[in-house]
Amino acid sequence: MILCKTYTVRRLLLTTSKTYTRTVSTSNTESSSNDGQIKQKYDVIIAGGGMVGCTLACAIGKNSLLSHLKVLLLEGSPQQKYELKPEYSNRVVALSQNTKSLMSSLDIWQHIENARLQPVRHMQVWDASSDALISFNSADIMDDDVAYIVENDLLLHAVNKELTSTDIKNVNIVYGAKISGYELSKHEASSNNIVKMNNGDTYSCQLLIGADGANSAVRNAMGVQNLSWNYDHMGVVATLHLAEETENTTAWQRWLPTGPVALLPLDSKRSSLVWSTTVEHAKRLLKLPEEQFVDELNDALWKHYPHSSAVQACTAWFGSCLKSFGLPDGAARQLPPSIESVVPASRAGFPLGFGHSTRYIAPGVALVGDAAHRVHPLAGQGVNLGFGDVKDLTEFLADAIYMGLDITHDSWLQKYETSRQRHNVPTQIAVDALYRLYTVDLPPVVLVRSLGTQLTNALQPIKKLIMSHATT
């Protein structure tokens, strides 16, 4: 089954509520009442106002070659008033250096820095079935931070704050937007996509962009094949208080027989938990009293799991060979923190799955973010892939305008698809393969992955290559 799914991936890759409107403009105002039909024409409509969709709207609005385009951002949720609370949210993202660069170029990063974030300067990943580990140190690899931990709602607030600034005059936002359906153009030369709303409003656009998540209605309207499956695992998240105050700039991940458990630093005393485990175990974790939950979590981080004597002997021998060549043998390691308590009501669970749209584009349509691809959170790459989509799509649209072409010109949309699939697909395959490799506990498999981990940890160029791909 595992081999079949991996082969399938490779083969396919080869071949009614009230609506509130905010107008981010001094000249383009729009009525959005429930009385009768109102048809508005836009150059670009973005379906989905999450982190990726809002960032794309901001990127288009701030690009000098694209700022003349009339853009509509449709968000299904009502407009939320953000307030920075003393306690951290339980949903966070690990932003890469490339994502930071994108946010800085759009003047979004300053809003995040003025609120709060936590840099990750070290990362340690180790196997509970063999104790083989790999560690990354920002000073040794990139001379910069490995990642930045930011709360989802804070990031979205920062993007919206910049998006609604007076600098951006060509973007309209409709909150509480309930879309009833799409009529998509069949040909590039006559791109005229229709978006129908539940309240009777109708919008048309040259370019429709689906940023509407893993269950994308835009992707469904395109009629493209979407390869997807569930992992029969759930992710359990929570906000944790550490037993001792530390610098806390290390991200920890331990591979258990049931899946990875990870701690992401928030500040000197708190960390965010992402624990991937079986559905049955996850449901039990969510129901446990707080003290029992903390005990089980500390066991997951510290407990000694049974090791195969043959695997231990082979990894010890291989470690001594590495040491004889002056390479690190993996014996030196940091110890993870102990957990003191869990923030009340911070525990939550969500399903885990894989998704790959075989096409990111159609005439006058493009997909970004989870609408195009979905990955397991074990490598923290999901949202970074989406922000990479934003960067590339904005650049290709600007290039098309610079060349005197329409933003729906097929060759330029094709360039976007090719560029992103060349980056996203290998990442998706690698993450899926890692998940499958580490959820098998047979001694021969444990031995192979342990030796591979030891070798990778010993070879700095390979570690640099891994980090280079992860941050682009």
What are the functions of these language-model segments?
Residues 45-47, 61-91:
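Glycine-rich FAD pyrophosphate-binding loop
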